[in-house]
């Protein structure tokens, strides 16, 4: 009996000890969880724009964010879809347009693209400061320091030595609390203009709306203001055209009311609109949004590390981690689900190509009509169809994921776009016939080189100028940013440097 008692006592002591160790481990992990999720003060005031400053409190999120570095492939969409160079003739996208890469490359891609030109100083170049708006947490830092209107005044090169950290923590999180928040004022204004009560926004809403700060349609609205010295200036303020609603037709009506145009088409002379990336607007019309699914649910799934649950910040294609994203709700096999997505993409690609071929041919036919002496009165109905049809086409595909976020709306828009382009071509055939030309065959635009030549893009000149810029002013920007403590050069280690035009040179 005594022996049994001793065995029981020993076992009890061991069990109690094990339970104590387990409790200590659980308490330790619980304390860690609370520390990470309490929302520590990363910076007492202002905006903590250097992403590495957030690592201390959010190591898992930061390490996963750095994985966006792996998404470094350059896909030259002008080479894959040469119709684009015709469709955008006279606009920057005819020079250079690539598929999106990881957030880690946001600054590099903005600098490398031929669209931003080759400035030689802070006050020249083709683009305004607004072209930095969605590329860096340095943007809200600067808005906080100099004011929104001052930020939006001047040329892109004005802030080359200031905006140096790629899309990261402070773009979506408040530096004082760590909570999700709007770092770009244009979104709050647009939501209110569209009838949203900002006080009623939920945490789940925010898991989409922080993305909507940038994945939206916008334009640069000229805004006069007076600085502290009394000088009148004009800012090009990022504005979301949501006052009439979030559909493509609502925004077209908004732009028409202001007689707004992004550019005049170089070939057809049509007053054109360029859709940016209306991902949020199209997503809001899809089945996922209607069922309360957020962007983060699919693109930033929760991960588990021990007792710690955190959000994966390796933002990318949900199909790359399908077990943690799509298949948590959809009960298909992985193959069946991938096949379903591929089918949606195939249908979109088919209708998109039809619309692009139609619109590109219509622009070239319009150019020929002008060449033969067509009048403004003859061409006006054609130009209206081209403006509207191309807007609907661009709106439907510019956000890249629209075929999945809102497949029905995407296909509807492509169908209407193709119809309007076709109607423009019918009218143009009649105009050309009236001016003595029947059966006109448009020039071949089947390759990037042929299409850019027709669009008047001096590609080699643009590349030469960009290379000169990168070996002079860009190096100066980086040196100044490092010296001022705005950029830690260690964050650039192991980073590839790619562009579509450097790949073009290598292939020649």
Swiss-Prot record:
Substrate binds at residues 218, 277. One of its GO terms (biological process) is anaerobic electron transport chain. The keyword Iron applies. The keyword Nucleotidyltransferase does not apply. Heme binds at residues 131, 134-135. Gene3D superfamilies: Butyryl-CoA Dehydrogenase, subunit A, domain 3, Flavocytochrome C3, Chain A. Heme c 3 binds at residues 103, 211, 214-215. Binds 1 Ca(2+) ion per monomer. It holds the Pfam family Cytochrom_C552. Residues 494-508 have a biased composition (Polar residues). Keywords: Calcium, Electron transport, Heme, Iron, Metal-binding, Oxidoreductase, Periplasm, Signal, Transport. Heme c 5 binds at residues 288, 326, 329-330. GO terms for molecular function: calcium ion binding; heme binding; nitrite reductase (cytochrome, ammonia-forming) activity. InterPro entries: Cyt_c552 (IPR003321), Cyt_c_NO2Rdtase_formate-dep (IPR017570), Multihaem_cyt_sf (IPR036280). Heme c 4 binds at residues 295, 298-299, 405. Its main location: periplasm. Its EC number is 1.7.2.2. Heme c 2 binds at residues 169, 172-173, 313. Pathway: Nitrogen metabolism; nitrate reduction (assimilation). Residues 485-508 are annotated as: Disordered. Catalyzes the reduction of nitrite to ammonia, consuming six electrons in the process. Belongs to the cytochrome c-552 family. This is Cytochrome c-552. The gene is nrfA.
